[in-house]
Amino acid sequence: MRTRLGQREDLALPARIPQTVKRAIRLATATSVLGLGLVAPTALAGTTAHLEKPGWVRDSHRALGAHDPRSPITHVVIVMQENHSFDEYFGMLPREGQPKADGFTFDSAGRPINSNPLPGGKRQLVFHQDQPCSGPEAGQSWNNTHKEIDGGRMDGFAAIEPHSMSYYDKSDLPFYYSLANTFTLANRWFSSAPAQTYPNRRFLYAGTAYGNISTDTSSYFDAPPPHGTIMDEFAKYNVSWHDYVTDLPDTALIGSNLENHPSDYTSIAQFYADAKLGTLPDVSYVESEDGAAGIATDPVRDQVGAAMGGSEPQQVKNAFYWSDGTDEDEEDSDVRLGQAFVSRVVNAVMSGPDWQHTLLIWLYDEHGGFYDHVAVPSAIKPDNIPPALGPGDIKGGYDMYGVRVPAVVVSAWSKKHAVTNVVHDHTSVVAEIEELWNLPALTYRDANAADLSDFLDFRHETFAAPPTLAAPNSADLTSCHTT
């Protein structure tokens, strides 16, 4: 059962202290730091003492679902792409525009010197990827991710796949580097679990993976999470939302979202129309092209078709296959296509009439198996549902984040050319939405997650006039797939 709304069991902190600071103080009492840099939960965190609980609301004096009148942000746009680590995309950023970015270590000649051991005693240095297809797949399964993290040593990547040590730079990703050098970049945004796409996206939609550790389409038929999803709260408290779909909606990875809210799914073309007209809903999930999701009878594909009245995009009607045109940034895809998609979405928001009232968060679901050097912190368990581990799975729980990923907040109120070192994960998006519309927390994780306050400065509208960003590299649809 949920905690009674408004119930507080936190530390006695003055009300004037910002929520982000309060959470940091609480978490400091609940964690300790090991010599390796891996943050480990203490008994206090294990018993959830001094933590906000599911059902907690941030403002007991404001109606549930009522927008915060103090905030100029009335629209949140979420653009979550696929499978890249911070260092793979932004390891070179300290030498290419943002010296405060926590990227690679460099020698006196400016060359990155981060490395990982290889079998046989040699070491693999990080190296520049010389073509736009980002494969081969480096390995982001539950077991591989735990091996890569290796207790916080972050030295297991190359042994699994040497190509995991590759990186891109500003010449490859001019638009992404322009985003990071213009707005506020997260130095400490971690995926929510050391696992693949499905569990990490469940955290974005429900604050928990509730047992899932892998990308398995059969999990679509799992029961809904115990406290529902943020989409259920949108419906209950009259917060408007849409999932703007190119071919497949990732929000439907929790099947109850599509089953319970079919009218909130619409086409990607409608996003651009709504952004231009100033008719975006309160919350928008903007989906790039997946390009593959199984076979022609995929259950998610069939549900999408039914929910959209048989009018799903042509890509969904076709038998599914890896497409040269996929723009979700999945490894093996042409990174120029993903960059072009994000550029279109960001520019649509910036040129629309609601720019001054919109917050866009661009981020990645997980690291795709690619190297990152920052030790992974411990995390608050979202609930009492453990991972559904098989006989060969490495023991572990949801009390640890996954590998660090890129994240930038784009807003007229974003701090200019800044970084935040606050620890965030995907439930920080949930926390920000809960903060803006005073929604009950779904799990312990989102109840205690840092929101997006540290990216923003509401004292100064830094970008009242939208900035001009670098154009993405043009893509010639280079074939990145052979199947």
What are these regions (language model features)?
Residues L11-L13, R23-R26, D365, F370:
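Short amphipathic alpha-helical "recognition" segments used for binding
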